[in-house]
Amino acid sequence: MAIQKKHGKGRLDKWYKLAKEKGYRARAAFKLIQLNKKYGFLEKSKVLLDLCAAPGSWCQVAAEVMPVSSLIVGVDLAPIKPIPKVITFQSDITTEKCRATIRQHLKTWKADTVLHDGAPNVGTAWVQDSFNQAELTLQAMKLATEFLVEGGTFVTKVFRSKDYNSMLWVFNQLFKKVEATKPPSSRNVSAEIFVVCRGFKAPKRIDPKFLDPRAVFAELADPTPNNEAKVYKPEIKKRKRDGYEEGDYTQYKELPAYEFIQSTDPIAILGSTNRLSLEQSKNGDVALAVLEKLPETTDEIRTCCADLKVLGRKEFKLLLKWRLAVREKLGFPTKKSVKKEEEAAAAVAAAEEVAKIESMDEEMRIQHELEKLKERNSTKKKRERRKENERKQKDIVRMQMHMVAPMDIGVEQAGPEGEDAMFALRAVEKGDVMRRLAKGKMVVASEADAKKDRDSGIGSSGETDDESDEELDRLETELDDMYDQFRERKAASDAKYRAKKARQARNGDGDEEWEGVSDNEKADEISDDSELEEESSGDSDDEDDTAPRKSLLTDLDTTPSDNSGLSKRARAFFNQDIFKELDGDMDEPMDEELRAALAGEDEDADMEDTVSKADSKKTKEKTADKKAAKKAKKAAQKAQQVKDDDSDDESDGGFEVVKSGKEDDWEDEDKRTKDGRLDIDIITAEAMTLAHQLATGQKSSHDVIDDGFNKHAFKDREGLPEWFLDDETKHDKPQKPITKAAAAAIKEKMRAFNARPIKKVREAKGRKKMKAAQRLEKLKKKSDLLVNEEGMTEKEKAESIAKLLRKATKKKPKQAVKVVVAKGANRGIKGRPQGIKGRYKIVDPRMKKEMRALKRVAQKAKKRR
């Protein structure tokens, strides 16, 4: 009998003929060739595993393209004729025997690429065939996960079906890149596509459900329809075109109205039904006749029941109310009736419980009450704990949103000076309360006296009008600080502003960061729980006034204070070992002017320390310490001078102590140049205009001083908020005239300033000069060695030195740009191509055509000229 060939349309196409010409066993060989041309995975593979390889065309392509001495293993259920450089055997890939045979051939190797082009026996129902194909692909995937190396490639054939997305999800979990493609040699009428999975993740453990067809291809249950959204929000309802329901191809549902009345889920009926029928057929149901005759069934209800799909929220509510009214009239259970029944049942149960409790003995009753009290107490504690946690959470959120200062949360916590503190000792000592407490004769004030105190300006918590004013001042200060923080955050995105702040930080004149509310400010708040009155006589008052005042706060610094006039910081400085030798001399009588100078300097240091606490504690304290140390050192030097000059004379005469000038003089000295002139740079057109006028004699220094006295010079800015001052600074400022020559000079100055090279360029030039100097130094050392070499003639020495000079001055050849054509393995590549070092440029035919077109256009434009 003659062999029958398939002569269907598209079977004997050009790929079939090319396969015959080139000696491939099947036209499927060109599918692998085209896939490799696009992704280039065969050239990089040393070990390849081909599953379902019969008749062997993919193994033939792999043997041709892969490097020499590569290991290629092919397996199929059908026999495969021998192929050069390929190991083939016959087995079922779903069995353990096949897995053991593959492991025997690969030994310790791992496969770089796993191919799968298999298909099961088909011919039954299409749904079953597609599932069998997906199951076979999953089995191949299971085999690939065992033998594939990390970063390997898996290429498989997949038939598009409802299980395709589930399989693609599994691929994405195990591989870094997953792409689905259809090569040109694949027939268009075929549902097959090829999935190329690259970059195997090689997890240490894989969940068996990933490779179990029952778990991967399990059908998910349909979600419960949201009928409430259809009823209460019909305007935002979106239609999902999922096809028709099984057996319902008209998509039209009609139900009798009495089913809607009797249903326990009326919303589901309203969301899924098109019409509620009130029409009664001959010999029909009596319930519909009753509904029709009820007074609640109005014409509007009949109209709404005619078409439910066009109703809105209001009409649906009307139908639900109509249903409740009808159910109540017909005697059906409603929410009200059910609630009444539950209340009655609860009352009966409570009565029975009361009867049972009364029968208990006394001990049981007491125990029951104790348990109730414990339960109530634990409930109360839980509630308080929850409120406290909520308050803390709100504080943290406020701090994260920059609504409060970070120190606010710390101040609010329980502590010696916080809100939850039991005693405010500083406040007690500060006021007149401590003197009254020392007497011990106090009683609780009456309500009438408390009312008098409130009328006189003292609140229930002992807070007077002055304290309320202090509270307002504190709130204003906090508001100004919050405004400063807001301005900082708003201007932080401006590059000029950041540069300005950096300059200020380098110069040391930047604003310090606000560190929150001080504890000393919180100590002024007094909260008394009861009002006290004194019962002592006037005589005792007089006696107590003369008594020394006692303090509740103990100073931890127990260092005895001396009457030398020195502050604590200065005294601690003079206690160092370097000044011990001066102790004997210091006991001698010192000049009164010198003592006054030292005392004045210490007072200045203390005053600076007090001011520094209001602004910024840390930075100012360091500055004050340095200044105090300098002044103390100068005072010690002066004292030593006095001792040297007048060692025999103990009188107060002989020299005059002159106090040092202001700090501004020192600052001016820092700003002066080496030749004594002030370091001033003119950077604005107004300053340049004034400089021209002073230089040309148009203005004198007295004129400049007179111009300084204007309406802007004596503005009272004390007490004004910061936001108001910012607005005034922007808009209310004097407009000084400028000349054209001054503007041109500033412009030329800025042009020269901008023409300077950037910092990177200057650094590069500096590095270049430094390297050249280093090479020259090495060259000098080598030339000195050659000159001192005795075994060489003068000519040889000169030639060697000239050779060194040529080698040192020789420039490195510029590396040429390598051109890489974007085709084959380099098509669509991202990053550096493999095997390319140095500079490169990727080109393609499209770019070549565009370059030719540009040259052609340029030549045409040149001819027109």
UniProtKB/Swiss-Prot annotation:
Residue ranges, annotated region (Disordered): 370-396, 443-676
Coiled coil start-end: 358-400, 462-492, 762-789
Pfam families according to UniProt: DUF3381, FtsJ, Spb1_C
Residues annotated as binding S-adenosyl-L-methionine: 56, 58, 76, 92, 117
Catalysed transformations (reactions): a ribonucleotide in rRNA + S-adenosyl-L-methionine = a 2'-O-methylribonucleotide in rRNA + S-adenosyl-L-homocysteine + H(+)
Bias kind Acidic residues: ranges: 463-483, 526-545, 600-609
Annotated Polar residues bias: 556-566
Alphabetical list of InterPro entries matching this protein: RNA_methyltr_RlmE (IPR050082), RNA_MeTrfase_FtsJ_dom (IPR002877), rRNA-MeTfrase_E (IPR015507), rRNA_MeTfrase_SPB1-like_C (IPR012920), rRNA_MeTfrase_Spb1_DUF3381 (IPR024576), SAM-dependent_MTases_sf (IPR029063), SPB1-like (IPR028589)
Entry annotated with the keyword Translocase: no
Keywords attached to this entry: Coiled coil, Methyltransferase, Nucleus, Ribosome biogenesis, rRNA processing, S-adenosyl-L-methionine, Transferase
Enzyme Commission (EC) number: 2.1.1.-
Biased composition (Basic and acidic residues): 386-396, 484-497, 610-627, 659-676
Subunit structure: Component of the nucleolar and nucleoplasmic pre-60S ribosomal particle.
Family: Belongs to the class I-like SAM-binding methyltransferase superfamily. RNA methyltransferase RlmE family. SPB1 subfamily.
Protein purpose: Required for proper assembly of pre-ribosomal particles during the biogenesis of the 60S ribosomal subunit.
Name of this protein: AdoMet-dependent rRNA methyltransferase SPB1
Organism whose genome encodes this protein: Pyricularia oryzae (strain 70-15 / ATCC MYA-4617 / FGSC 8958)
Gene name linked to the record: SPB1
